[in-house]
Amino acid sequence: SGIIDRYHSLYRDNQIYNEAALVIDVKTGKVLAHVGNASDTSDSHGSKVDVIPAPRSYGSLLKPILYLCSLEQGILCPTSILPDYPANFGGFSPKNYNVEFDGVVPADQVLVRSLNVPSVFLLQRVGTPRFLERLRRLGFTTFTQPATHYGLSLILGGAESSLWELTGAYAGLAHRLLAPSDTVWKVSYLGGKGGTGQSRLLDASYNTSGFHP
């Protein structure tokens, strides 16, 4: 909790009042730390609310999953070139964080630099319906609308997910790489204590992901 409080003191001047952390041992599936909020957050900002299971915009956190999905489907390799120029997708005109464009960018650098525009082009290639189905197979439950509801903004935080589900998806993929022969993997608390109602969403998520080492 000390780390969370330290970041809270850094970010509150930017009107960021809630921070949380969830740490999982990807080899065992055990939750090592669950800090639902900063301890010095005032009641007016929901200090007693555990924000880990709360659905919120995930920003760019789905980009690595899209990248993996694209590699799996043979749509690109790390050195493939992706477009990075101003574009309008049916009224949606994404911009990069620095509001600049490079023309073209290698796919691995798109991921490293978390570029928005090439990521939207990539989602267009993969297809929002196909990517959305993959996310649901990974254990995400908050994406309840059809692909047309989210559109290409899905890759830029245009929907909501929880820290619990995001951490579970990443941990499941990491476990798949570390122990590909395992057939059972479940996130649980140390001492065998069950998690919140969301804990079951992480059960064997890597087994249903379809990603392979």
Regions found by a protein language model. Name each.
Residues 76-131, 175, 192-213:
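Conserved catalytic neighborhood of penicillin-recognizing serine enzymes
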